[in-house]
Amino acid sequence: MPGKLLVVATPIGNLDDLSPRGRAALAGADLVACEDTRHTGRMLARLGIDKPLLSLHEHNERQRLPRLLADLEAGRVVALVSDAGTPLLSDPGFLLVREAAGRGVPVEAVPGPSAVLTALVVSALPPYPFTFAGFPPPKAGRRRSFFRRFASLDHTLVFFESPHRLAASLDDAVAELGDRPAALARELTKLHEEILRGTLEELRAAVAERGALKGEVVLVVAPAPPAG
């Protein structure tokens, strides 16, 4: 009889945001598959949970599949987590979920924190429809093309970005999307949480004045204005 794959959302900054069900899922799993065993190990230690950990990240997901699928088909319960938030959203795990479901292994979501939704609801921008596009490409030419794809979309747009590329991404977003309302959310749920609201041009100027921001960043951009 197959085991079960639990897709467990974990805190994006504040450990108190882990749900009782999430904690129970981690405590009851036979194995925790995670991006960084050190990071997840520290979180589990703070929760008083001691479980075997197996790294699962973008560079080894295909190589890990046989081992994890064998565990699931042998009846083991595997909890899948990312470093923070809900797995699969710009994080590894999709291949595992797809293959497990295709083999008849039960897959359950244990919902909880999500940087995407947290940033969206505090952005003061229309919450739906929205499109989450993940991280822009690191190279300038591809990044410009990436933003251009969304220039006429009448959805609120949500992007992740690393602090050291934020200024360049804002330059390209202004060039391709125009100067429309936007919000930058950083260090969500943490002590130094900050939400910057304005237009893309105003946010670009603020980042240029302050220098590189610290912490994870979510950029939320208003829908394209009506044509004409």
Task: Say what each PLM segment does.
Residues 1-59:
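Glycine-rich, flexible N-terminal cofactor/catalytic loop recognition
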Residues 2, 76-77, 156, 160-228:
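A contiguous loop/helix-start segment that scaffolds small-molecule binding in enzyme catalytic cores
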Residues 26-32, 104-108, 156-157:
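Short active-site oxyanion
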Residues 38-40, 85-86, 115, 165, ...:
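Alpha-helix capping/helix-boundary segments
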Residues 55-62, 136-140:
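Conserved helicase motor
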Residues 57, 65-114:
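Glycine/small-residue-rich loop that forms an oxyanion/phosphate-binding "nest" at active or ligand-binding sites
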Residues 63-68, 142-146:
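Short acidic active-site motifs
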